[in-house]
Amino acid sequence: MEAALLVEKNLNQALLDLHGLASARGDPHICDFLENHFLDEEV
């Protein structure tokens, strides 16, 4: 169980890093795709 949480945390961080890179490079299509399919807002 702990390993699964670590994998999920690492994957989420990689997606956030990718989103940051796409944002810095001015690629709204990748940003939108990541936001709509992977980066749900958490309450």
Swiss-Prot record:
> In what residue span(s) does the Ferritin-like diiron domain sit?
1-43
| MF GO annotations | ferric iron binding; ferrous iron binding; iron ion binding
- Presence of keyword Iron: yes
Which Pfam family name is an example for this entry?
Ferritin
User: Do you know which InterPro entries this protein is assigned to?
Assistant: Ferritin, Ferritin-like, Ferritin-like_diiron, Ferritin-like_SF, Ferritin_DPS_dom
Sorted alphabetically, the Gene Ontology BP terms of this entry are: intracellular iron ion homeostasis; iron ion transport
- Mind listing the UniProt keywords for this protein, alphabetically? Cytoplasm, Cytoplasmic vesicle, Iron, Iron storage, Lysosome, Metal-binding
Could you list the residue ranges that cross the membrane? none
Task: Tell me the compartments it is located in.
Answer: Cytoplasmic vesicle, Autophagosome; Cytoplasm; Autolysosome
PROSITE patterns the UniProt entry points to: FERRITIN_LIKE
Q: Which GO terms describe its cellular component?
A: autolysosome; autophagosome; cytoplasmic vesicle; ferritin complex
Assembly, in brief, is:
Oligomer of 24 subunits. There are two types of subunits: L (light) chain and H (heavy) chain. The major chain can be light or heavy, depending on the species and tissue type. The functional molecule forms a roughly spherical shell with a diameter of 12 nm and contains a central cavity into which the insoluble mineral iron core is deposited. Interacts with NCOA4.
> What's its job?
Stores iron in a soluble, non-toxic, readily available form. Important for iron homeostasis. Iron is taken up in the ferrous form and deposited as ferric hydroxides after oxidation. Also plays a role in delivery of iron to cells. Mediates iron uptake in capsule cells of the developing kidney. Delivery to lysosomes by the cargo receptor NCOA4 for autophagic degradation and release or iron.
| Entry-linked PANTHER family | FERRITIN, FERRITIN LIGHT CHAIN
* Annotated family: Belongs to the ferritin family.
Name this polypeptide is given? Ferritin light chain
Annotated organism of origin: Ovis aries (Sheep)
Q: What is this organism's lineage? A: Eukaryota, Metazoa, Chordata, Craniata, Vertebrata
Gene, per the UniProt record: FTL
